[in-house]
UniProtKB/Swiss-Prot annotation:
Residues 249-397 form the GAIN-B domain. Residues 349-397 are annotated as: GPS. PANTHER family: ADHESION G PROTEIN-COUPLED RECEPTOR F4, IG-LIKE DOMAIN-CONTAINING PROTEIN. Disulfide bonds join C349-C376, C364-C378. Residues 674-695 are annotated as: Disordered. It is a multi-pass membrane protein. GO terms for molecular function: G protein-coupled receptor activity. Most adhesion GPCRs undergo autoproteolysis at the GPS region of the GAIN-B domain. ADGRF2 is not autoproteolyzed at the GPS region because of the lack of a consensus catalytic triad sequence within the GAIN-B domain. Keywords: Disulfide bond, G-protein coupled receptor, Glycoprotein, Membrane, Receptor, Signal, Transducer, Transmembrane, Transmembrane helix. The gene is ADGRF4. It comes from Homo sapiens (Human). This is Adhesion G protein-coupled receptor F4. Glycans are attached at N61, N169, N177, N209, N229, N250, N257, N263, N264, N286, N309, N340, N379. Residues 1-21 form the signal peptide.
Length: 695
């Protein structure tokens, strides 16, 4: 009788459990910071409106149930009298389903606590209350037991939210001793919701911090990853890649290269993480490790999830690169290939601040921004571990400056050619004294140097290094460097001649000696600087930039071989102009105060003439180097320097009354010769006619 009652009780319990399971509907409610656990009790049902169709009242809300096999609801908000989808919690995943194939009794796990364990010969299934418990029980070594169920699920907003919380829980509870196998399974799960097809669904997740939580969870999990080899590719999924290597204070400069596609049809986008040598010296002698993770779609997901956030108005234009480094390392160099490579697609380097949950512009500094790629110097901290580039809002500014430069260079080249033609025409009439001779020698060489430099600059700006010869680009860079330096040194020599003319009155230097000094300064000094620069930097391939035919800055600072001489000469020439201005305002003996206006006009004229001839316009370049400089300085600098050839023609040639007089005399002489030629041609003909008439 006792055995019969026990058997009856067991049958009743089994029937009760099966009935409960058949009526059980799993539903999860995800909030920031919640743990994924088995739902207890019946899910709460909210107000559900069967249809959200037709006209509506503004700001009103509506909800509909999810499709079959999904639990949750879809929320709509009325906007302009139309229902628009605003939120979605439809999910087909649950903690139980993740492990249903791992044990036959997992479907009974929810009701298991109510089973009377003292019943003879009955073993209740072990309760799976959380993801951590399920993984520890079923797949503690590789986490592979959860991947198939996740990868087969549809990427609805509810499932995405579930998977984000799943990864967040794993990073929090199971991130000790992360192996390569665990990282692979973890990344497979993350890859599923990083797919381009899932991007639009991120916008409807109620928790707008889900994308930021995902990024932070991946970084936290990767921090505990152990690398066995010196360098290895750990994860190579379509939408997430992980690489790492061992480092110590004796390691040379290290870099990690990524090549990923936004989808299966587009070309790969490149990214590189570089740890400078000076940073590696900060490490202790014992080995450390550096890990980097690349995401091609996460930038779009972060933007999609924060469309209402005013701090994210611009599009991410490259990979999102996360790094996990030892605490002593603070500075890294990142290279991003642009997704949008149009000419006006300027970029801004940024880092993702995990606490503020927004892109932080102060985390990075721009090192290089060209059409195809961007190089950034970024500060790595515990709250800023992920970096990318945003589309800059200053694209129209750059477009305007490009137009100014293009038009200005064209006008400048034509003006310089005309200047040289005029100088050749009036040369014999204007070089009557040693001072005038050297003055025009300076103007001619300034014009020749600037004209040649502009031509080489145009050649270099249209030169494709990847498609054309490397050595040819080196030659273009060398000649551009040499002739721009020649321009500045000839302007320096002209300034020295002005000072010499003011200070030395009674003693004059021989013309031949002045010519030797002039050509030694004008061409000798630039040649020495240019040759020395290429000899020092080119053996290490650091003479020119990798993307353009111009002096390198990032690696060897070869650009200083142009910038330092140029700005020093501009400073010296500015002093000369001030000396001329002071000397001009000295009143002559017997002059009255009524001549003040005349003196001011004379000073203004001298300054206007000397400014382009002595290169003072390049001084505005200092202002443009300062971050946050007003657009006005950039436009002024572009105008003055692009049109420098025109100003040389205007102030150095046309406004010189001696040249104008010489041109008039030359024109009169040409007219006189043409009339004489006409008379000479008509003379014999008229004589023959008279002889014929007399005959």
């Amino acid at each position: 009788m006792k055995m019969k009652s026990q058997a009856t009780m067991i049958c009743c319990l089994v029937f009760f459990l099966s009935t409960e399971c058949s009526h059980y509907r799993s539903k999860i409610h995800l909030k920031a910071g919640d743990k994924l656990q088995s739902p207890e009790g019946k899910p709460k049902t909210g107000r559900i409106q069967e249809k959200c169709e037709g006209p509506c009242i503004s700001s009103s809300n509506c909800s509909q149930p999810c499709a079959k096999d999904f639990h949750g609801e879809i929320g709509f908000t009325c906007n302009q009298k139309k229902w628009q989808k605003s939120a979605e919690t439809c999910t087909s995943l649950s903690v139980e389903k993740l492990f249903k194939d791992s044990t036959g009794a997992s479907r009974l796990s929810v009701a298991a606590p109510s089973i009377p364990l003292h019943i003879l010969d009955f073993r209740a299934p072990e309760t799976i209350e959380s993801v951590a418990q399920g993984i520890r029980k079923n797949c503690p070594f590789d986490y592979a037991c959860i991947t198939d169920m996740v990868k087969s699920s549809e990427t609805t907003s509810g499932n995405i939210a579930f998977i984000v919380e799943l990864l967040k829980n794993i990073s929090t509870d199971l991130s000790d001793n992360v192996t390569r196998e665990k990282m692979k399974s973890y990344s497979e799960v993350a890859n599923h919701i990083l797919d381009t097809a899932a991007i639009s669904n991120w916008a409807f997740i109620p928790n707008k911090n889900a994308s930021s939580d995902l990024l932070q969870s991946v970084n936290l999990f990767a921090r505990q990853l152990h690398i066995h080899n010196n360098s290895e590719n750990i994860v190579n999924e379509l939408f997430i890649q992980t690489k790492g290597f061992h480092i110590n204070h004796n390691t040379s400069e290290k870099s990690l290269n990524f090549s990923m596609s936004m989808n299966n049809t587009t070309e790969d986008i490149l990214g590189m993480v570089q740890i400078p040598r000076q940073e590696l010296r900060k490490l202790w002698p014992n080995a450390s490790q550096a890990i980097s993770i690349a995401f091609p779609t996460l930038g779009a997901i972060l933007r999609e999830a924060h469309l209402q956030n005013v701090s994210l108005p611009r599009q991410v234009n490259g990979l999102v690169l996360s790094v996990v480094l030892p605490e002593r390392l603070q500075e890294i160099i990142l290279t991003f290939e642009k997704i949008n490579k149009t000419r006006n697609a300027r970029a801004q380097c940024v880092g993702w601040h995990s606490k503020k949950r927004r892109w932080d512009e102060k985390a990075c500094q721009m090192m290089l921004d060209i059409r195809n790629e961007v190089k950034c110097r970024c500060n790595y901290t515990s709250v800023v571990m992920s970096f990318s580039i945003l589309m800059s809002s200053k694209s129209m500014t750059d477009k305007v400056l490009d137009y100014i430069t293009c038009i200005g260079l064209s006008v400048s080249i034509l003006s310089l050619v005309l200047c040289l033609i005029i100088e050749a025409t009036v040369w014999s009439r204007v070089v009557v004294t040693e001072i005038s001779y050297m003055r025009h020698v300076c103007i001619v060489n300034i014009a020749v140097s600037l004209l040649t430099a502009n031509v080489w600059f145009i050649i270099g700006s249209h030169f494709n290094i990847k498609a054309q010869d490397y050595n040819m680009c080196v030659a273009v860079t060398f000649f551009s460097h040499f002739f721009y330096l020649s321009l500045f040194f000839w302007m320096l020599f002209k300034a020295l001649l002005i000072i010499y003319g003011i200070l030395v009155i009674f003693r004059r230097m021989m013309k031949s000696r002045m010519m030797v000094i002039g050509f030694a300064i004008g061409y000798g000094c630039p040649l020495i600087i240019a040759v020395t620069t290429v000899a020092i930097t080119e053996p290490e391939k650091g003479y020119m930039r990798p993307e353009a035919c111009w002096l390198n800055w990032d690696n060897t600072k070869a650009l200083l071989a142009f910038a330092i001489p140029a700005f020093v000469i501009v400073a010296v020439n500015l002093i000369v102009v001030l000396v001329v201005a002071v000397n001009t305002q000295r009143p002559s003996i017997g002059s009255s105060k009524s001549q003040d206006v005349v003196i001011i006009m004379r000073i203004s004229k001298n300054v206007a003439i000397l400014t382009p001839l002595l290169g003072l316009t390049w001084g505005f370049g200092i202002a443009t180097l300062i971050e946050g400089t007003s657009l006005t300085f950039h436009i002024i600098f572009a105008l003055l320097n692009a049109f420098q050839g025109f100003f040389i023609l205007l102030f150095g040639t046309i406004m010189d009354h001696k040249i104008r007089d010489a041109l008039r005399m030359r024109m009169s002489s040409l007219k006189g010769k043409s009339r004489a030629a006409e008379n000479a041609s008509l003379g014999p003909t008229n004589g023959s006619k008279l002889m014929n008439r007399q005959g």
